[in-house]
Amino acid sequence: MAKDDVIEVEGTVLETLPNAMFKVELENGHVVLAHVSGKIRMNFIRILPGDKVTVELSPYDLNRGRITYRFK
């Protein structure tokens, strides 16, 4: 998938799930299932409920995403 095809939105982590998955509520109110991107995992960045994050969504499946950034 090309980088141009992704939709980037901001959201808040609602809960932590097993296998590094998270429930994230987007700014528009939708709740999506998101996993952590490789760069965040490599740098041991902790993501906790309540954190504000940037999520990349595929135009093909808007219910799943990838967390690419955690705001400080």
Swiss-Prot record:
Keywords: Cytoplasm, Initiation factor, Phosphoprotein, Protein biosynthesis, RNA-binding, rRNA-binding. The keyword Oxidoreductase does not apply. One of the essential components for the initiation of protein synthesis. Stabilizes the binding of IF-2 and IF-3 on the 30S subunit to which N-formylmethionyl-tRNA(fMet) subsequently binds. Helps modulate mRNA selection, yielding the 30S pre-initiation complex (PIC). Upon addition of the 50S ribosomal subunit IF-1, IF-2 and IF-3 are released leaving the mature 70S translation initiation complex. It is found in: Cytoplasm. This is Translation initiation factor IF-1. InterPro entries: NA-bd_OB-fold (IPR012340), RNA-binding_domain_S1_IF1 (IPR006196), S1_domain (IPR003029), TIF_IF1 (IPR004368). Residues 1-72 form the S1-like domain. The modification Phosphotyrosine is found at residue 60. Component of the 30S ribosomal translation pre-initiation complex which assembles on the 30S ribosome in the order IF-2 and IF-3, IF-1 and N-formylmethionyl-tRNA(fMet); mRNA recruitment can occur at any time during PIC assembly. Disulfide bonds: none annotated. Gene3D superfamilies: Nucleic acid-binding proteins (2.40.50.140). GO terms for cellular component: cytosol. Its main location: cytoplasm. NCBIfam families: infA. It holds the Pfam family eIF-1a. It comes from Bacillus cereus (strain ATCC 14579 / DSM 31 / CCUG 7414 / JCM 2152 / NBRC 15305 / NCIMB 9373 / NCTC 2599 / NRRL B-3711).
